[in-house]
Regions:
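P-loop NTP-binding module
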Residues: 5, 12-166
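Interdomain "pre-motor" coupling segment immediately N-terminal to P-loop NTPase/helicase cores
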Residues: 1-7
C-alpha cells in the first residue's frame, strides 16, 4: 500500500473518493490475494496489527473493509485498540459506546453497530477506554460476539492494538 500519511491528518476511508486511484488499486490487490489464501465457505475473520502505534493499522482496516464491501460482501470492523482507539475518528463519529461497553454488558450489539456511507460496511467503535482492555478481549463474551457476527457478516475485520509495547 503506498504511503499516504502526509496527505491526510487521520486514518479515513479514501477508496470511495477515487476508486481508480493507486491506493484503491492496492487495496483491491490485497482483497484478491486474501481470496486465494482461504477460499472455504463461511465468514472470515481478519486481524490487522503492527508492532507499534502509528504504522497505519486503522487506515488499512478502514480501506480494506471498504474495498471488500465494494465486492458485495457484508463487512464489519471491530475496534479492539482500546488504549488508542481510532476507528471513530476515521468515520467521524463519537466514541460513546462500543466494544468496551458491549463486552461488559452495558450496551447490546444492535446499539453499538454503526453504518458507514458504503453499503454493507458497518463498524463498532472501541467505546470508552477501559482499565483492562486485554481482559475484555480474551473474555468468553468476545468469543460469543465473534460467533454471532459470523452469521451476520461475510468478513469480520479487527483493528487490533499493536503487538509491541503500548
Amino acid at each position: 500500500v503506498p504511503k499516504y500519511k502526509k496527505e491526510i491528518p487521520i486514518s479515513q476511508l479514501l477508496i470511495d473518493k477515487n476508486p481508480k486511484s493507486l491506493i484503491a488499486e492496492s487495496f483491491r490487490t490485497i482483497r484478491t490475494n486474501l481470496q486465494f489464501v482461504d477460499n472455504t465457505a463461511g465468514a472470515k475473520t481478519i486481524a490487522i496489527t503492527s508492532t507499534i502505534s502509528g504504522e497505519g493499522k486503522t487506515f488499512v482496516a478502514i480501506n480494506l473493509a471498504g474495498i471488500i464491501s465494494f465486492s458485495g460482501k457484508r463487512v464489519i470492523i471491530l475496534d479492539l485498540d482500546m488504549r488508542k482507539p481510532k476507528i471513530h475518528l476515521g468515520f467521524g463519529v463519537e466514541n460513546i459506546r462500543g466494544m468496551s461497553t458491549l463486552l461488559i454488558g452495558k450496551d447490546d450489539l444492535e446499539s453499538c453497530i454503526q453504518h458507514s456511507t458504503l453499503p454493507g460496511l458497518h463498524f463498532v467503535t472501541a467505546g470508552p477506554i477501559p482499565p483492562n482492555p486485554s481482559e475484555l478481549i480474551i473474555s468468553a463474551k468476545m468469543s460469543e460476539l465473534l460467533d454471532g457476527l459470523k452469521s451476520m457478516y461475510d468478513i469480520i475485520l479487527i483493528d487490533n492494538p499493536p503487538v509491541g509495547l503500548v
